[in-house]
């Protein structure tokens, strides 16, 4: 015959402690929504079907997939830094997985790279894969490189996010953002978890000012793409370029572009003119509102769910990037209307021009 006992606790001493224990237990059982992140491109469709766990996941209908951009973690987004995270490799088949919702990206990329013999480095996008739909700046890189491999993969195992599809490889001329795919596990299946439906919009929607969405394409030329000796030029027009540096923000490049146009510093011959920016010029101009919405926590999050085989078990400390504090006399960065203020911030000074390898190079 079994014996049942009840643990008695001193009433006064443990009353408050036991109350909080009950609250924690009830809260955990009622509101637990674990978040599993696929961090290394190893997802198989069958894996998701197998993720039926006791007390957490009774149906795959409780899973909601979300695309999370890497730039929210504070990775460097300038073209020279971003492209170093990608590399060509053969013998690995591409994988594609869909996601239901994503976030707006500040920086996206679009590559058109050819081999020295003129053949294409990157494959065309398969049917159904469209460019990432929400990019403030699209960095479009054209040029040449050895491209020693069949596909361009992410060296850190992240995905390339397209329009509701994430791929392990880069497709030619198709805009993408870097990111990972995360699964939200809901307490119960909800059809309307994401209230807004995917947008069905015309290709030229960004030209409509009423859409409330503004995207700018910034063009670059690359030589030796994918090597340690890659050189990048920011394209002002088809004859005028600026030697690109990692410290240049998209906003600075747009200011520089407008300054060169309005001050008549474009190439006035049939030759190629390459500018170099004075190292003393401050290039840290940016849109602080973007980082206000991307702040992450230094706190270590303990992830507990049945997706444990798909993400790292060791909790990682998120990188925090805080916006540059504004002085009392400063205001938030505004959209450019005129070029007067930018001419003051980027003084044009003429230095001696030299001809190198048949190209005229000057310093600003």
Curated annotation (Swiss-Prot):
Using the record, list the residue span of the signal peptide; answer none if the entry has no such feature: 1-32
Recorded GO MF terms: channel activity
Kindly list the residues the record flags as site (Cleavage).
324-325
An example of a Gene Ontology cellular component annotation for this protein is: host cell membrane
Glycan-linked positions: 40, 204, 228, 238, 257, 268
Which cysteines are cross-linked by disulfides? 108-135, 121-147
Q: Which family does it belong to?
A: Belongs to the filoviruses glycoprotein family.
The name this protein goes by in its record: Pre-small/secreted glycoprotein
The scientific name of the source species is: Zaire ebolavirus (strain Mayinga-76)
- Gene name, per UniProt, is GP
